[in-house]
Amino acid sequence: LGDVYKRQARSSADWCEVQTGSGMAGESLLRLKVAKNTRAEARSATITVSVWGYASPVSFVVKQGKGLIEQGDGKYRSVNEWVAEYMKSRYLWNRAIENVSLDYSLCYDFFFFSILDGVAAQDEVNREDGHWQGQKRMYYYSRLESDAPLSRTPGEAYVGSGIYLLDATRLGDDYIGIVVMVVIPGTPAAEAGLVRGDFITAVNGEEVTESNYQSLGRAVYDGAVDVTVNSVTWTDNGTTPVLTPKGNVQLGSATFTSPAIYMDKVVEIEESDKKAGYLLYMGFDVDYDEELIAAFDRFRAQNVTDLILDLRYNNGGDVLSSTVLGTLIAGEAYKGQLYAHMTFNEDRTEAGESGDYKIGVKETFESVYEPIERALQHALGLKKIYVLVSETTASASEMVINGLRGLDIEVNLIGMPTNGKNVGMEGVVRSFHNYDFLLFPVSFYIENAKGFRDYSDGFTPDVQIDDSAIYPGEFGTMMDQLGYLALQWIKTDNKPQLPSAMHTRGSCRSMRSFGDLWENRPVQPVGGAVMQPVREE
């Protein structure tokens, strides 16, 4: 037959291409190339095979299920291609992305969440990417942001009164108002004399009620208002509130920054020769590491014997800053010892990649960072610390707890269980369409020197108490419930024993919150345990 082939095959549809259309009769391999279905309905193609010498051909049917219809306009296709490439390389559960159908035509935020949701649909393999309440994921830790100021970090500019947090509250049967929970130093609110525990009963002459607290709360956050302020004391063993008018206060509005350190002070323990350094630390930010070191210098100058680290409102930040703080606490005796070990996805681990951060060692996985080494000269060198925690305490904050415990430093926790973020993120920035896009996928587990990382359910406090129903007192004093317990622990060297009723809700100085003013606040830190983002060109 010479060059005459004895077998021919053809397809009835262009999407199903026969790549070995002709060949010799007998046993041979038939190769098909099938295109992805982009239509909403299933489809089929008939493959017909004719063999020389046989009167009738034979055929079979190739069926393909419903395809993916592009739902977007494709404006951000180049952004999405970059996001997908980085996620497939860096995401901690990157191998599961191969099983996700991706629509590159979507807006970048929908596309990003389609990846996360697609991985989650595979038996929640990325369960540790996010905060859960029961069986419900409340949010993902991984994030993608553009230039739009959706959330910010310590040091960024805001406009308003400078109140970090308010709470709409009822006191007993007689009083309703808005309680000041946290005031940012150096802001109009601080300059006007507002402090934690002030009780606002009217805004611009309008009394606070359960129907208007949202709008009045926003007005107080924004500033440029007149507020009626009261101080609160308690009688009858802390069961009866007494309001004392402080008068009307003109609350201004200005541009301000939210620093990482809201307060550092030294508290002398009564009937004791002990002194406690108190640090209200709101976010791990490398821009404030020099101030952090200076705060420890002030502690050293006053010969503090103990440290109360208040991380109730600290949801994390820079891994480098966490290592600086760990070094300032641990000191020279732990120099060179492992503070945190980063474990990456399977592909990177198989390639031998990992990352370490050590006490007092400036060489880190991500960069050479001098303040870590310099922190040794300013360290307290403690074997025991007291940490005030809440559900907001997360990531780089939990890294401090876990890292110090890995060194056998005693870390005593007071408050409520922490967030449980045992993972961190490597960031990357790239410009598209004259906008910057910042991508922070979860890309590593955080382990301590003992290899422990199993705290996705959070750290359980040694003294567990919900202070959200206890009227707030000034930070770093005996009037602050968690601060009081820490100071008592330091004074007696014994863990405080609480009445059973106080393990969940306060039994004295009781307040009843009736509305959420958390989401309305202008200062909303990003948090996380993050490595400094790398800019790609």
Language-model features: where?
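C-terminal edge beta-strand
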Residues: 54-67
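Short, surface-exposed loop/turn segments at beta-strand-coil junctions that are enriched for proline
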Residues: 35-41
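Flexible, low-complexity junctional segments that flank or bridge functional domains
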Residues: 68-307, 321, 331, 505-537
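A short beta-strand micro-motif common to beta-rich folds, especially ectodomain repeats
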Residues: 41-52
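Surface-exposed loop/turn motifs at beta-strand-loop junctions within extracellular Ig-like
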Residues: 36, 51-53, 231-233
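Low-complexity "stalk/linker" and mucin-like segments enriched in Ser/Thr/Pro/Ala/Gly
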Residues: 10-28
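Short, small-residue-biased leader/transition segments that mark boundaries at the very start
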Residues: 1-5
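C-terminal "post-core" interaction segments
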Residues: 276-279, 283-294, 298-306, 315-537
